[in-house]
Amino acid sequence: MAVLKLADQPPLVQAIFSGDPEEIRMLIYKTEDVNALDAEKRTPLHVASFLGDADIIELLILSGARVNAKDNMWLTPLHRAVASRSEEAVQVLIKHSADVNARDKNWQTPLHVAAANKALKCAEIIIPMLSSVNVSDRGGRTALHHAALNGHVEMVNLLLAKGANINAFDKKDRRALHWAAYMGHLEVVALLINHGAEVTCKDKKGYTPLHAAASNGQINIVKHLLNLGVEIDEMNIYGNTALHIACYNGQDSVVNELIDYGANVNQPNNNGFTPLHFAAASTHGALCLELLVNNGADVNIQSKDGKSPLHMTAVHGRFTRSQTLIQNGGEIDCVDKDGNTPLHVAARYGHELLINTLITSGADTAKCGIHNMFPLHLAALNAHSDCCRKLLSSGFEIDTPDSFGRTCLHAAAAGGNVECIKLLQSSGADFNKKDKRGRTPLHYAAANCHFHCIETLVTTGANINETDDWGRTPLHYAAASDMDRKKNILGNSHENAEELERTSEMKEKEAALCLEFLLQNDANPSIQDKEGYNTVHYAAAYGHRQCLELLLEKNSNMFEESDSSATKSPLHLAAYNGHHQALEVLLQSLVDLDIKDEKGRTALDLAAFKGHAECVEALISQGASVTVKDNVTKRTPLHASVINGHTPCLRLLLEVADNPDVTDAKGQTPLMLAVAYGHIDAVSLLLEKEASVDAADLLGCTALHRGIMTGHEECVQMLLEKEVSILCKDARGRTPLHFAAARGHATWLSELLQIALSEEDCSLKDNQGYTPLHWACYNGHENCIEVLLEQKFFRKFYGNSFSPLHCAVINDHENCASMLIGAIDASIVNCKDDKGRTPLHAAAFADHVECLQLLLSHSAQVNAVDHAGKTALMMAAQNGHVGAVDFLVNIAKADLTLRDKDSNTSLHLASSKGHEKCALLILDKIQEQSLINAKNNSLQTPLHIAARNGLKMVVEELLAKGACVLAVDENVSRSNGPRTSSATDVQKEE
């Protein structure tokens, strides 16, 4: 909030501050604006209310001042008057209808302000006008919270007397008691507890009032709560007790009090850390640690990750505390779960004094930690030369490798502190020692662009052209030093932009400096690794422009030589990774810009695919071809750019492309791909360049087919505006209308339909005779069906005899079927397809009972037979659809005596497929012996079939109904044949 100079304010404001009513009247009479706003949107009435001058407030209001005006923090004059504890001002404002429920930007009402500012009289005036004193602000705090936080005992008393909820909690579930305890207001704490406040209440993170008091060192509150008998070792959600919190915050007096009251000094939290761990690590925990150790705290207790209190002192360099722990029995070489001792940790963080304390106390400097590294490894890796010097003084085998074969010299080279390298070399470290991947310390120094380390190692005789297991030399690693990784660490936020740029430039210079030094010392840039990549490839891949320039100076033919040695040329690598400056260097010396990688892709293809517009521009300006196709998909750079919607790249390519409709292996044009992927800008640009909207791929699909299929609305609209053909058919005869109906795009379907029906040759059948109505019904798109049925053209079935009604019921789209019947005629329920099957057959085939009910309610013929003589019941029975069979037998009363062309009844068919439940449902309605023993064309009775398929319950039921066990089929087999469970045996059991 700005502080304004009074002399710069309007005369009316100055008069209010001077308290001169006569001058104010005169100014108002001279038409001074009583509602004028300052820079903070405060009015003269805000000023008067702040000053608490009731007479001037009255005068301003009577002169037209707005009583509920809000400043830019939404504070009203009433808020200001209450904050100033002016009882008279509050009374005047309320008399003139000031809003007692007005909220500022923090949702605080005048009562909140009164509670926070100890405006007791003001609160007494306001409260009778409120419906509740428990209104919360944006943080969920009530007036009681504010009074407790600020220690206003009388205000707390008043609020409680007026019905304040003593256990109301804010958005973090903190009660007024939490805030009073944290701030150390003993009288308020006692008052709240006496009025029934829950002394063991917890906030969302499990903190109790005891935790709150302990964290802020409120010793009197802690004593009071302990005297009330609260659980001293109560934990929050992290498992921390009040003792943990006190130690973490360095509250030694509270720690002493808690220990005296019997707090568990070895209580672990959820991660296994005790109060001693916290005291060892915290900034002000020295006295806390002394108290804990003197009261029996276990100095060697370990957390879940194996860290002892001594480890914690090592992390933060608390060497005095480490001495205390060691003197009290702290195990100096205890290891955490990674195998690190406190000495490893101290070396990692560079705490020389602590290292000295540990070594003096007998710490093992040759102890292996994480990955079998010495403390010296960690000190060297993190460039702590003083720590290295201290650790070297203890003496051990300096070239001992870790789990990856790396010596301390490898670590120092990676860390980049040349002093560490010199110390190790002077102690006899072998600079040609290799790790398990064949890398020397020089490889590590080069990979991290540590120039002085490289210089030192080379000067002392390191082999500059030594190759590792991948065939890479230090020169390869220097060329491949990763600037992008540094960028990722810094992030891409606006505030880091300048630092990012500086870091990038610095790393580029370092890489060039390292490369130049290596080249001057006879490093061979032509050496290829096992993948055929040389230094040029790596410099190009990682975008080191200066490195490439150095290499060009060294050997002008080197770039051309690099193009034929590996699957990808330097040009490809620079283009793919978007390094346009490196690319420009390469382009200066390369002849063939259209060289292909192993998949036939050019550098321009890769740059376009990745969206690197600057690289695309550089390649085009040097004459790279935009029409070269790869070997796999036969795509061009135009196709590559639209796949990911890289419109800037596409625009550059189209400026030099002769044909925007070039096709790939599937016959797809860039426009088709742009529409398919929904890249609106790319579609717009291609249409501007007059790309063909009616071109079809090898399957006959156009861009419009793709747009409708993928649902990209704006792309479709742009195509329609170009008068695209909407009746074009794909290889299966489907038009965009078919696709719209199949995908449920009713709006497009309506628009396309209007255009289609206005054309002379309007054929809307695909190669199988299916119309858009078939497709809409099959996929259950009611909105599309509604659109189609609005046209008389679709109010009669035509096309494939497997009608739209068949399509609807076979997929259980009951509403769609109902719409068809209502719009056309109920007679369609008995229409037949080429095999003589009705929609009832289709519904029975798919076991859709609701559709069966619908069809039969519109007089579908339940016993209609198809060309094979099968009824709907037979369909359901043969396919084992219990629901459909049950409905057709028991509700629809289907004829059970009907037979198909092979003389099978529905019972035969159910039994033949092993559908026992269906067979039993049918059998339950059969009493006639003629049906029980009915024979099909193979002379088989239901008993033959049931017995052969092992349907025991069906066999039992058939026998109970008198089925003949002596019936013989055409193979002279009786129903008790050897392949089945014996029907005769079943009869004997009965």
From Swiss-Prot:
Repeat positions for ANK: 7-36, 40-69, 73-102, 106-135, 139-168, 172-201, 205-234, 238-267, 271-301, 305-334, 338-367, 371-400, 404-433, 437-466, 470-499, 531-560, 566-595, 599-628, 633-662, 666-695, 699-728, 732-761, 768-797, 800-829, 835-864, 868-898, 902-931, 938-967
Sorted UniProt keywords: ANK repeat, Repeat
Keyword Protein transport: no
Pfam families recorded: Ank, Ank_2, Ank_4
UniProt-listed Gene3D superfamilies: Ankyrin repeat-containing domain
Domain of life: Eukaryota
SMART domains cross-referenced by the UniProt entry: ANK
Signal peptide extent: none
PROSITE patterns documented for this protein: ANK_REP_REGION (PS50297), ANK_REPEAT (PS50088)
InterPro entries to which the protein is assigned, alphabetical: Ankyrin_rpt (IPR002110), Ankyrin_rpt-contain_sf (IPR036770)
Keyword Repeat included in the entry's annotation: yes
Disulfide bond annotation, renumbered to this chain: none
Assembly mode: Protein phosphatase 6 (PP6) holoenzyme is proposed to be a heterotrimeric complex formed by the catalytic subunit, a SAPS domain-containing subunit (PP6R) and an ankyrin repeat-domain containing regulatory subunit (ARS).
Role according to the record: Putative regulatory subunit of protein phosphatase 6 (PP6) that may be involved in the recognition of phosphoprotein substrates.
PANTHER family reported in the protein's UniProt record: ANKYRIN REPEAT AND PROTEIN KINASE DOMAIN-CONTAINING PROTEIN (PTHR24198), SERINE_THREONINE-PROTEIN PHOSPHATASE 6 REGULATORY ANKYRIN REPEAT SUBUNIT A (PTHR24198:SF192)
UniProt-recorded name of the protein: Serine/threonine-protein phosphatase 6 regulatory ankyrin repeat subunit B
